[in-house]
Amino acid sequence: MEKLSSLLEHVSTVAILGHVRPDGDCVGSCLATWNYITTWFPGVQAQVYLEPVPNIFRFLQGADQICNDQDADICYDLCIVQDCSDTLRPGAFIKYFKTAKKTVCIDHHISNGSFADVNHVFPEVSSTSELIFTLLEEEKITKEIAECIYTGIVHDTGVFQYSSTSARTMNIAGKLMEKGIDFTRIIDETFYTKTYNQNRIMGKALMDSKLYLDGACIASYVTMADMEEFEVLPKHLDGIVSQLRVTKDVELALFLYELEPGRFKLSMRSNNKVNVADIAVTFGGGGHVRAAGADMEGTAEDIIGKICAEAKKQLC
């Protein structure tokens, strides 16, 4: 696929899907696509379908136009699925993918199975938002589109610190800055700023963390009861696994939070040796070499034990 515009020439309706529990790259890339279509293809009706997005992303142009339900029975001419490695990731919104006349997947997960009619998948790229930049004509990237793309890149690179960050990533970030975006505000207010309760729950997670595999792995978890006590939601737990990862001499960081009794969301980060994407796929998840996750059943301790057993094979 050369440019996104080549797919829009003969369509009237477009659905844009991201993944459940949308993060910065998901929200940023989806809204970048939406803004591009609504700005330069006014005759095309475009709709983003996502679960409710974190409030920190509400400043992005079009965030108030995101549809959070799948009640409408619409057969779209084109369905673009972004930042999703398989057909489970969009959740209930996958109905629009299944009924669309043509489907496209734009993604950067190594576990992507190329499930659409057209698949634009590059695992070596830092983020789906970076991919979106390459699919748009630079002269048509408005300040609003640039804000969306920059936000996505910032969040999936950990503010340009993860190994997926490349020279091209930095070059693209510079071009986005030239569009006049308030890049310091985007970084401070969407990545670093935390509420008091977010800091408290992170503090608990760090205090409760334990070392495994002779110090090569650090893990922690929070329960539904913990989230209720600290008055936070799953979307407020961003950053905990990254903070665990920077512990000295740690190779693998695990963070789990309880989705429902007996079921946890697992996030994994590694530094140099462990391919967490391979581990995630083993347990029905997916992701990248250094960042991956899965939904798993069992107690937190049992899940940590299973992950450590797989990681040990790579560390030997």
Predicted regions and their residues:
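Hydrophobic helix-and-loop "lid/oligomerization" segment in the mid-to-C-terminal part
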Residues: 2-18, 28-58, 72-78, 158-316
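Generic enzyme active-site microenvironment
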Residues: 17, 21, 81, 105-106, ...
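Short glycine-rich anion-binding loops that position phosphate/pyrophosphate groups of nucleotides
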Residues: 20-22, 84-87, 109-111, 224-225, ...
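Short N-terminal binding/cap micro-motifs at the start of the first secondary-structure element
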Residues: 23-27
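Hydrophobic/aromatic residues located in beta-strands of well-ordered beta-sheets
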Residues: 46-48, 103, 149
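Active-site cofactor/cluster-binding pocket
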Residues: 61-118
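Solvent-exposed alpha-helices and their adjacent loops that cap or buttress functional pockets
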Residues: 71-74, 95-98, 112-113, 141-142, ...
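Short alpha-helices
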Residues: 106-172
